């Protein structure tokens, strides 16, 4: 909670950004393209922390590109609003999913999660399946991410991955999207970026829908999504991008 320490290259880049003006829609697009290329994923977006990325991604899977639904959130009446999560994977930060208006639905037991637990839990209101990746050794009593993706995608359900702290080895950044997940968040405070920044990595459709929910989308498109408080300034966008490049 004391904050991260940015490296000199990041602070220098942020200072340069402080003295220049650019439309944030354009800056997010350029930064996202650079980040996506660096980690070999289809698309990326700089957010106000990994928790923000989780909230925006949850809103994105519920509302998509429908402006009426975007403005309706966090009221999810008439929408698919259920996010499935393994009972064994409930954790401190899954609250970020509920902030968008979603309802968390547990599957499996505290002892073990089986493939059929997920299969049988998918219903008409399922918006996505959430998966938490921890730094510890893989727990074989959990349903694996590979199995989760296979089962969910067979029913056209997107998979969201919280891998906020998985920044080492370096290949972890973007690994879960490359594996087939639709979204992965990264907390860039762990890579010498400003503590208040994070990354949303994912498919082009997912990141586009996240952008519609964002602060930039709210002001630039004049569509009132839930992301207005999730502001990222140009200095932070540049700082996070440069930090990733050096990491």
Predicted regions and their residues:
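Glycine-rich phosphate-binding segment of PLP-dependent enzymes
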Residues: 1-23
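An acidic intrinsically disordered interaction segment
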Residues: 15-27, 153, 160-163
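Conserved PLP-enzyme active-site core in the AAT-like
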Residues: 1-6, 31-47, 51-245
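Hydrophobic face of alpha-helices
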Residues: 11, 28-32
């Amino acid at each position: 909670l004391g904050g991260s320490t940015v490296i000199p290259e990041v602070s220098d880049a942020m200072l340069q950004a402080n003295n220049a003006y650019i439309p944030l829609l354009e800056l997010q697009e350029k930064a996202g393209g650079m980040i996506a290329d660096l980690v070999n994923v289809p698309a990326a977006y700089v957010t106000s922390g990994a928790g923000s990325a989780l909230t925006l991604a949850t809103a994105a899977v519920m509302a998509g590109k429908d402006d009426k639904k975007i403005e309706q959130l966090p009221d999810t009446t008439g929408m698919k609003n259920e996010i499935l999560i393994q009972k064994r994977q409930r954790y401190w930060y899954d609250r970020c999913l509920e902030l968008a208006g979603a309802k968390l639905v547990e599957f499996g037991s505290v002892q073990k999660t089986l493939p059929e637990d997920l299969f049988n839990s998918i219903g008409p209101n399922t918006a996505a399946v959430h998966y938490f990746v921890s730094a510890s050794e893989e727990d074989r009593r959990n349903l694996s991410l590979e199995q989760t993706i296979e089962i969910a995608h067979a029913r056209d359900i997107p998979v969201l991955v919280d891998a906020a702290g998985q920044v080492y080895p370096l290949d972890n950044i973007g690994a879960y999207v490359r594996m087939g997940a639709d979204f992965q968040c990264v907390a860039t405070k762990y890579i010498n970026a400003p503590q208040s920044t994070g990354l949303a990595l994912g498919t082009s459709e997912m990141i586009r829908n996240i952008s519609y929910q964002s602060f930039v989308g709210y002001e630039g498109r004049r569509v009132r999504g839930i992301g207005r408080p999730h502001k990222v300034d140009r200095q932070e966008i540049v700082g996070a991008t440069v930090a990733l490049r050096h990491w």
